[in-house]
Regions:
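Non-catalytic interface/linker regions that flank or bridge core catalytic/transmembrane domains
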Residues: 1-8
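Generic N-terminal amphipathic, Lys/Arg-enriched alpha-helix
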Residues: 10-25
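Divalent metal-dependent catalytic cores for phosphoryl transfer on phosphate-bearing substrates
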Residues: 18-22, 45-159
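A short, charge-rich alpha-helical start-of-domain segment used by transcription regulators
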Residues: 27-29
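Active-site hotspot residues in diverse enzymes, especially metal/ion-binding acidic/histidine motifs
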Residues: 38-42
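Active-site/ligand-binding-proximal alpha/beta "capping" segment
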Residues: 163
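Charged phosphate-binding loop/patch that engages nucleotide di/tri-phosphates or the phosphate backbone
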Residues: 166-172
Length: 172
């Protein structure tokens, strides 16, 4: 297995999340920690995944929430922030984690971005071929609550209660 590039170390990722939590505290940080532990546990048993990379990807997938209380904007904010820091692999996860289907319309929240920002996000998403880390974090994001992992249906109800139910919810 080759360790992917473009991800911070665990120590760096923990520092980034701590700084983000100080800026915008909320249950999203506990969810991120649960996601990190779950992703690392799954990666430890997978022959092609690196446990440390999976941990940092899980820890930072929602890092865009550092900017404040937003809906789908956190995807773009995280992508831009992590790219600016020189972590394109982690930035990619911030972008892909909300889209098991590569279409902005399938998101579980409203878009609080400008039309130009949405177009940029759509283009960036379309240009990717998902890898095992993208899929791993999509999976763990779908089962991680702030208090721990749960069955996927419970998490989907949690998301639907907060963000609503749309035409893509069942397809996901």
């Amino acid at each position: 297995m080759t360790k992917p590039t473009g991800f911070p170390t665990r120590v760096q990722a923990e520092a980034l999340l701590a700084e983000a939590e100080a800026r915008n505290p909320g249950p999203w940080t506990a969810h991120s920690r649960v996601s990190a532990l779950g992703a690392a546990a799954l990666a430890a048993r997978h022959p092609d995944l690196d446990e440390d990379t999976a941990y940092t990807a899980g820890l930072l997938h929602d890092i865009g929430r550092r900017a404040g209380v937003t809906a789908m904007r956190h995807v773009l904010d995280g992508y831009l922030y992590l790219n600016e820091l020189g972590f394109p692999g982690a930035a990619r996860i911030s972008l892909t984690h909300s889209f098991p289907i590569q279409d902005l319309a399938c998101s579980a929240g409203h878009w609080d971005c400008t039309a130009e920002e949405m177009a940029f996000t759509a283009q960036a998403l379309r240009g990717l071929e998902y890898d095992a880390y993208d899929r791993l974090i999509q999976l763990i994001d779908a089962v991680a609550l702030p208090a721990g992992c749960c069955i996927m249906e419970k998490r989907m109800v949690d998301v639907a209660l907060r963000h609503g139910f749309n035409a893509w919810t069942l397809n996901k």
